[in-house]
Amino acid sequence: MKIETYIDSLVSYAMNCGLAEPDDHVVLVNRLLDLLRKDDYEPSDEPQTEDLEEILKGLLDYAVEKGLCDDGITARDIFDTRIMGALTPMPREVIGIFRYLYLENPEAATDWYYKFSCDTDYIRRYRIAKDMRWKYASSYGEMDITINLSKPEKDPKAIAAAKNAPQTAYPKCQLCVENEGYAGRMNHPARANHRIIPIQVAGEDWRLQYSPYVYYNEHCIVFNSRHTPMKIDKSAFRKLLSFVDAFPHYFVGSNADLPIVGGSILSHEHFQGGHYTFAMETAPVEKEVSFQGFEDIRAGIVKWPMSVIRLTGADPERIADLADKILLAWRGYSDESVGVIAFSDGEPHNTITPIARRRGQDFELDLVLRCNITTAEHPMGVFHPHADKHNIKKENIGLIEVMGLAVLPSRLKKELTDLAEALVTGAPLTGDLEKHAAWVSGMNYEFTAENALDILLQETGKVFAAVLEDAGIYKNTEEGKAAFQAFVNYVNQ
């Protein structure tokens, strides 16, 4: 296909999805010619393609051939983001449409903004489609298991280039507002096609965007316009509840503010939300509890592998007050019978992962108790995936996993496929498969070519549920339930 055909196809794509109008045609063609360092142009007589992945590949192959772009994943991503940036409207236009739609209906505004973020290729739909997703029916509810394949692995050239690249503090991190329209470099993603929505959260200037990796439907990131550290406190609870007041069709939660039990970015205050129902949301209250002075707030312990107190009521300020009381109690609480130590050597260990949503007209806040204490037996964390499950999951249990969605490493796609084949043929488990030997030795199945992979996928789901039990403070035993009640009693003292 001629390069002009790809240029024409991309301009038609922009028109068809509303990124541009017919009056923009000549300017868009000229922008693309400039990026491709092409001086001449005749409209193509070949049939156009509507497949964005195919269009961008054609343009990238041309750029590589002409020496405009290195032929590595990172370099190609930077260049095709520049291409899409040439078609992306300015922030004022995007913000204007969002605000106009929001006045009609918040859901209409986010529907439009999500589609826009996909159409600009900020969210690469064709990569997201490669992710593996399946369900596991646990005793706590139907959990989501995913193997993330859409986040590209860095190629060796990019790793070397990033190592040799001059260090810069702009943007300060991948969440800062300065990423909007940023060209990118070998050690920082390109965001030329990225547009952010300014919003108010509890009276503060915040921003709304989507995650480019979309772990679940309309996976959004809500972040402070200032580069300020994560902090779980009463203010955080008020902000979460403020967001679901403004966007009642979305849930929103925050990672904890301590290492091991927190997320990967602790330096910039942010939340994650979206339009998705997680297993934790549908998990019932197993035991109702009452907090003195807050009889207007319904409270209960949730039937979930992690230790969750659910607060529901009509007044978000009252919920935030009670959540703060529980948090302050938990920060200073120790119970050596279950391994909870509030402080060691002056370091705090206890915090909370909070999740807010609307329940009809009411507001709801789930408080997940966390503790990042380590021991000689569990050097990565007592309430962290234990070593016998590291073949499947050894990374931190963050907000998304807490709610019942496993984000598993991409290595597992090949490992589980190869493992299934080895179980059928009886081949020895060597190399990358050796780490799975103890796991599969405990399985009692008749493996066949037809069922082996399905069995392993379900067993992977079982491991994830057990990982959440590892991360839970109070185990689902009589002793664990009694210890949980002891903490509730402590809050009420």
Could you tell me what each predicted segment is?
Residues 1-222, 226-229, 303-305, 319-323, ...:
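Active-site microenvironments that recognize anionic phosphate/pyrophosphate groups
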Residues 235, 244-267, 273-327, 331-334:
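Catalytic or ion-translocation cores adjacent to nucleophile or general acid/base/metal-coordination motifs
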